[in-house]
């Protein structure tokens, strides 16, 4: 289910392309839920800027896939189907996992908090009925910025940081994980 980093497109995505990609992801999610009446993990990489498919985002994605599969194995949860693809919004993974949706969401939240690359992952859990379990459902604060302790959304809206600084931080986190062989 991994993606080859060397095949990244480096396409600068437009806002309309991004919106279409998100609509297509939602349609894929609903199709998966019809095939598998178990919770669905929909996984993407948080990638600032217009280039969503790069060697870096694919490598970050691959670490996330490995971590999600290890989480399922550790918990004894069966992955019924899994797939990886690339859309205009970057690498995307979907895993149908036979587990209680609430337990799955809590475990993925813990994964996002404990893994060194967790801040770069956006892991959604959808119930078999198609409801997205949100961080807010668990009284969790919004995601933090990669460079400061502000809300990531506030920094993004205000363009608080230079894109190059954010991308450099992403790459530094990835290189640290690769150097330590963290999965």
UniProtKB/Swiss-Prot annotation:
EC number(s) recorded for this UniProt protein: 2.7.7.61
InterPro entries documented for this protein: CitX
Source domain of life: Bacteria
Statement: the UniProt record of this protein carries the keyword Membrane: no
Keyword Cytoplasm annotated: no
A Pfam family annotated for this UniProt entry: CitX
Gene Ontology BP, a term: prosthetic group biosynthetic process
Enzyme class: transferase
Protein keywords: Nucleotidyltransferase, Transferase
Cited function: Transfers 2-(5''-triphosphoribosyl)-3'-dephosphocoenzyme-A on a serine residue to the apo-acyl carrier protein (gamma chain) of the citrate lyase to yield holo-acyl carrier protein.
Family: Belongs to the CitX family.
Name the record gives this protein: Probable apo-citrate lyase phosphoribosyl-dephospho-CoA transferase
Taxonomic source organism: Escherichia coli O127:H6 (strain E2348/69 / EPEC)
Lineage: Bacteria, Pseudomonadati, Pseudomonadota, Gammaproteobacteria, Enterobacterales
The gene coding this protein: citX
């Amino acid at each position: 289910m991994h993606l080859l980093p060397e095949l990244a497109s480096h396409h600068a995505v437009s806002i309309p392309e991004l919106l279409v990609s998100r609509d297509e992801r939602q349609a894929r999610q609903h199709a998966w839920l019809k095939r598998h009446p178990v919770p669905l993990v929909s996984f993407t990489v948080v990638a600032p800027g217009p280039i969503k498919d790069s060697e870096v985002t694919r490598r970050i994605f691959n670490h996330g896939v490995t971590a999600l599969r290890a989480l399922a194995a550790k918990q004894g949860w069966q992955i019924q189907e899994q797939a990886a693809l690339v859309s205009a919004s970057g690498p995307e993974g979907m895993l149908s996992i036979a587990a209680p949706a609430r337990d799955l969401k809590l475990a993925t939240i813990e994964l996002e908090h404990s893994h060194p690359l967790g801040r770069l992952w956006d892991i959604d859990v959808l119930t078999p009925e198609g409801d997205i379990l949100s961080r807010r459902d668990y009284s969790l604060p919004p995601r933090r910025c990669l460079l400061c302790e502000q809300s990531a959304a506030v920094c993004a809206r205000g363009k608080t940081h230079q894109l190059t600084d954010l991308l450099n931080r992403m790459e530094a986190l990835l290189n640290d994980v690769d150097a330590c062989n963290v999965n």
